[in-house]
Amino acid sequence: MKKNTATIFLSFIMTLVSINSFGQDNQIRQSQKSSVTQYVGADTKITINYSRPAVKGRVVWGNMVPYGLAAPDKYSNGKSFPWRAGANENTTIEINNEVKIGGSTLPPGKYSIHMIPSKSDWIIIFNKNNNQWGSFNYDESEDALRVTVTPVEAAFQELLTYNFGNITDNSVVAFLHWEKLKVPFQIKL
């Protein structure tokens, strides 16, 4: 009888642990996932996947998101690193055809997007490693392309957003919009 009671008790505890663990997976994220897709030309598909942090009354540029590379920390193996251009997992861009960004060719594929902000021009990095958490393990040797762009002042945007504008038959401007800045980069066929 003791053995049977112990088995029932252990089964009950395991069920509680399983239910609790399962419930953890369904928590609402602080920075919700989002995605935006644009077609250009006959069949070029561009998709940006990202997570959307909120301003929440904070100063973003030069504070929450530092200018230049972020200082080394315990997650980055003592190395400085660029901003992940969003929150949580890497922000990614996926293109199905060759395009030009900043006059340079980017082959078809899926790339992580990282940025190095400054008070004037920003560097946007398209990196071949598209499956990591943030930019902590960013490796410059895996860069597919780096372009320099100039951010522009914009209306206040609480949640980080990527979108497309200035759409033509052979080009589009993709941009990040957050706080009071837009960071545009033109994509040409």
Model-derived regions, located:
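Bacterial Sec-dependent N-terminal signal peptides
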Residues: 1-25
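Targeting-peptide/extracellular-domain and disordered-appendage signature
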Residues: 24-107, 112-189
